[in-house]
Amino acid sequence: MQKHYWKCILYCFFVGIVISCSSTPNTTKKPQVATSKPVVSKPSQKGLEKKSDLPLTAETAIPFLQRYGAENRENKARIETPLGSFDILLFEQTLYHRANFIFLTKQNYFDGTYFHRVVTDFIIQGGNSDNYDTGQKRRKIGKYLLPPDTRNGLKHHRGVISMPSSQIENQHKLASPYEFFIVQQSPGAYHLDGNYTVFGKVIRGMDVVDAINALPTDKREWPLTNMRMRVTVLNQ
């Protein structure tokens, strides 16, 4: 009887060792570590320019924008300001101007620039600032002008977006690619037709344009309150 008793004790001891050496579920939750390489989605090449394309020049800008416009068909953007946001539609008829605006938007050029010129009951003009970063962005993107496209029948109705001429005196009315203005005057500013290129229009939020146009300005027509903007492409 005693011998049988000790056999039972030894058997239980052996079973206990075996059980203690086997794995048991851990009640503490831990993050799972994947043993396989994660799948990383590659960013779309659409809208990306080669480093060799920049900075753009008077010789390279138009061929670049022609190619860029064909590869980037977006035509809507949102402009955010301290007084609210508004949406714009860019016209297909003005190929280079549409492509240029989309290109600069994707370069984040407009972010941090201002509506720096306000003429009451006439226009608001944006795309410039007195910040160092704006000049740096322009140097990186390039020095170039856009040709006029004024024979497409588009008129300077209230709410349209147009391209101001360069400050450089030229008989061909070449436009500064970095700035734009929006007609606030009602029903329009038709005396501008034929001299400036209409390339888009406001499709939502014209009340925001009116609010910016009502801001007090200094003698240079610069708003006393900086109207910083942020521009994003809507239909990517």
What residue ranges belong to the model's regions?
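Bacterial N-terminal signal peptides that target proteins for export
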Residues: 1-10
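Intrinsically disordered, low-complexity Ser/Thr- and Pro-rich stretches
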Residues: 2, 18-19, 23
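Bacterial N-terminal signal peptides
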Residues: 9-18
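Cyclophilin-like peptidyl-prolyl cis-trans isomerases
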Residues: 21-236
